[in-house]
Amino acid sequence: MRTLWLMAVLLVGVEGGVIELTKMIVQEMGKNALTSYSLYGCNCGPGGRRKPMDATDSCCYVHKCCYKKLTDCDPIKDRYSYSWVNKAIVCGEKNPHLKELCECDKAVAICFRENMDTYDKKKKINLKLFCKKTSEKC
């Protein structure tokens, strides 16, 4: 159980309603979010923003920027509700701050699907030793 929780925490940027984000990625991609994206490239998983290696990695970069813009919510602890309607993610929160969090997670799940042709299994477990800092602002 402890190992499962650790893997969940490593998921895309460490933050977010991990359960919700994991489900969104499975629904959009049909892939195991933990094994496919938690350490992908230079931006997925723990750590700061780095120069993206490809479009899939850019999804994680943008996701971290999205979290950075959130106000009045804690992406690590706060949970939100959403539904899967006609193969689409629908954020269902009345709380505008939790809806923003849901929209950040929805965007990264859709970004992964739209850029699945750039996914490179060789980048699936990247220790980030050779990742370059970026001067790009969110």
Curated annotation (Swiss-Prot):
Keyword Lipid metabolism: no
Listed GO CC annotations: extracellular region
Cleaved signal peptide residues: 1-16
InterPro entries, per the entry: PLipase_A2 (IPR001211), PLipase_A2_Asp_AS (IPR033112), PLipase_A2_dom (IPR016090), PLipase_A2_dom_sf (IPR036444), PLipase_A2_His_AS (IPR033113)
Cystine crosslinks: 42-131, 44-60, 59-111, 65-138, 66-104, 91-102
Record-annotated site: Hydrophobic membrane-disruption site (MDiS): 127, 130
Source domain of life: Eukaryota
Site (Important residue of the cationic membrane-docking site (MDoS)): 121, 124
Pfam families in the cross-refs: Phospholip_A2_1
Site, as annotated: Cationic membrane-docking site (MDoS): 128, 133
PANTHER family the record matches: PHOSPHOLIPASE A2 FAMILY MEMBER (PTHR11716), PHOSPHOLIPASE A2, MEMBRANE ASSOCIATED (PTHR11716:SF9)
Name of the protein described by the UniProt record: Basic phospholipase A2 homolog 7
Gene source species: Craspedocephalus gramineus
Lineage summary: Eukaryota, Metazoa, Chordata, Craniata, Vertebrata
